[in-house]
């Protein structure tokens, strides 16, 4: 009888409303569970990807005792207005929540859910502080469009270049080329739409604002969400291009929430996934085992029940951080991220000036240089950029790096390779590794693109972390820092978030290159960014002498 009642409840039809925004534009909104009667807590999703695609999840929430509200974003599918990426999502989110609180089926307590774009709009709405919003669950989401589009000053080219034609579709008689790579190599990159042959206002706007200026104000809520008193569940994968921002949101809320309640009621779940495989076991053909499986909806429901259900008494404690250890293929818990018990451990770069390729003399040891060592140099050629993955690999545009074997790329002369000795015992790394490098270039700008790699006894090499920094962004993203050709600079490259077991017999390796194409745009070396009409080769140097001791810093845990 209970099963039949549950099934009947889950089958109730949805209702569709045209919800008015403050400017009169009406947004198509599906409501699941309103006809069951009574006032209930409400879970809301706002999406540009078609509300009808979220019906299965909405029904799961409905079956769990919630009213589920799913809305097409402004200008998308059945909604009115013009779609401008994130430009109205703060106010539209506020207005929709306000509308929900006034409905007869709402008890005025609201949570939000969704990943990627629907996760980002949760932050934008939350930044407006709408009454009734009590909990959020953004999965693989950034509160800032700027930091979705750029990292370390480099444009996420495959992501943004691919999204441009999807948002501003080609006119009749034209179609988006199947292979955009040749177009990504033309200049100026800011005019990719002209190169393709039709206007793409969204792409051009993003590509012509490589600095965090006033253009981004409506789409950049990173600072505005500080001071919120709002429980949030953050779920993301290490290989996700939004990993850094998702984890950053958790860390900011833990530090800057307005109350102890807000600071304590944050949860981070970190798994071995990329943007399209959250909760799955296989990523780019690499099987992490059944333990990697995660039901995001189930995790969200447990979180929502804790804060929205009056008839649920949650357990006193919950793990604030659950993280999957790659190589161990097991979950661990922590009270914070990075884990407080992690100890920063340095590995210093060394060579006799020939660290080019994996067959070179680049090494890493726990000791810094005790005498002068020759610098390593490579020539970065925009006409022949280092690919982000080996030839033949087809990487989704929403990925920046994946667990794909890459040793063949380490045979290139324009890749510096530093390999530590094989481990005599297992080494557990968990947290936010970074590289501190002393560098120079004979040009007005350059990129330093890094990958941290697990080298197996067989010689296979799998990336576990990565980062990139454009030299003109070395002091931040608000205004450029000029680069004087030949001058030595100390830079810090954030290598993101990871947890992996470097097993006995495996070795840790650092790659340093001048590009990872097409994940990131190729630096023209002219200092003109996306407006460069030409490019040039550049010689990039890495130093590791006593006074210029380049190193990586690893957060290491005792096993």
Label each region the model flagged.
Residues 70, 79, 119-122, 135, ...:
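Catalytic cores of eukaryotic secretory-pathway lumenal/extracellular enzymes that build
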Residues 34-102, 144, 150, 279-288, ...:
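Cap/lid segment of the alpha/beta-hydrolase catalytic domain
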Residues 228, 234-236:
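Short beta-strand/loop motif that positions the catalytic acidic residue
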Residues 244-266:
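Active-site-adjacent alpha-helix of alpha/beta-hydrolase-fold enzymes
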Residues 11-38, 419-425, 438:
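N-terminal cap/lid segment of alpha/beta-hydrolase-fold proteins
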Residues 104-117:
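Alpha/beta-hydrolase fold nucleophile elbow
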Residues 183-187, 278, 285-559:
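C-terminal, loop-rich substrate-recognition/catalytic regions characterized by aromatic stacking residues
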């Amino acid at each position: 009888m209970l099963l039949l009642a549950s099934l009947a409840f889950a089958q109730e039809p949805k209702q569709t409303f045209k919800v008015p925004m403050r400017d009169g534009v009406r947004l198509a909104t599906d409501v699941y569970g309103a006809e069951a009667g009574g006032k209930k807590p409400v879970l809301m999703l706002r999406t540009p990807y078609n509300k009808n695609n979220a019906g299965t999840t909405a029904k799961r929430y409905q079956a769990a005792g919630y009213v589920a509200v799913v809305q097409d974003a402004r200008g998308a599918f059945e909604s009115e207005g013009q779609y401008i990426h994130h430009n109205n999502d703060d106010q539209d989110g506020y207005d929709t929540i306000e509308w929900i609180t006034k409905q007869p089926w709402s008890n005025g307590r609201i949570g939000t859910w969704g990943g990627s774009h629907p996760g980002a709009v949760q932050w934008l709405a939350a930044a407006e502080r709408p009454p009734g919003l009590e909990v959020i669950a953004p999965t693989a989401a950034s509160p800032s469009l700027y930091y979705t589009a750029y990292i370390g000053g480099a444009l996420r080219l495959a992501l943004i270049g691919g999204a441009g034609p999807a948002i501003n579709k080609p006119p009749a008689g034209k179609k988006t080329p199947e292979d955009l790579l040749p177009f990504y190599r033309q200049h100026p990159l800011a005019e990719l739409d002209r190169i393709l042959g039709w206007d793409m206002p969204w792409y051009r706007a993003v590509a012509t604002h490589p600095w965090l200026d006033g253009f981004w104000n409506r789409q950049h809520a990173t600072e505005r969400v500080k001071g919120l008193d709002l429980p949030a569940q953050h779920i993301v994968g290490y290989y996700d291009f939004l990993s850094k921002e998702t984890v950053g949101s958790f860390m900011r809320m833990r530090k800057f929430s307005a109350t102890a309640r807000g600071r304590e009621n944050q949860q981070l779940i970190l798994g071995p996934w990329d943007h399209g495989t959250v909760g799955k076991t296989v990523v780019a053909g690499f099987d992490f085992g059944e333990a990697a499986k995660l039901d995001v909806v189930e995790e969200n429901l447990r979180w929502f029940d804790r804060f929205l259900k009056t008839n649920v008494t949650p357990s006193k404690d919950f793990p604030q951080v659950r993280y999957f250890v790659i190589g161990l293929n097991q979950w661990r818990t922590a009270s914070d991220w990075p884990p407080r018990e992690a100890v920063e451990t340095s590995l210093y770069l060394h060579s006799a000036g020939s660290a080019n390729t994996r067959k070179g003399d680049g090494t890493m040891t726990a000791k810094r240089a005790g005498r002068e060592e020759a610098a390593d140099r490579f020539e970065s050629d925009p006409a022949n950029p280092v690919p982000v993955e080996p030839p033949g690999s087809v990487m989704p545009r929403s990925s920046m790096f994946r667990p794909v074997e890459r040793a063949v790329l380490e045979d290139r002369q324009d890749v510096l390779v530093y390999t530590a000795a094989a481990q005599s015992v297992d080494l557990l790394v968990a947290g936010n590794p970074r590289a501190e490098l002393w560098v120079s270039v004979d040009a007005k700008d350059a990129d330093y693109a890094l990958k941290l790699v697990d080298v197996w006894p067989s010689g296979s090499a799998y990336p576990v972390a990565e980062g990139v920094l454009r030299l003109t962004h070395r002091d931040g993203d608000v205004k450029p820092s000029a680069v004087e050709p030949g001058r030595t600079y100390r830079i810090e490259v954030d290598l993101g978030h990871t947890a992996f077991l470097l097993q006995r017999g495996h070795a840790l390796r650092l790659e340093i290159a001048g590009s990872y194409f097409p994940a990131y745009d190729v630096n023209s070396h002219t200092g003109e960014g996306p407006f460069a009409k030409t490019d040039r080769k550049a010689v990039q140097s890495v130093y590791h002498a006593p006074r210029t001791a380049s190193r990586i810093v690893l957060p290491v845990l005792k096993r």
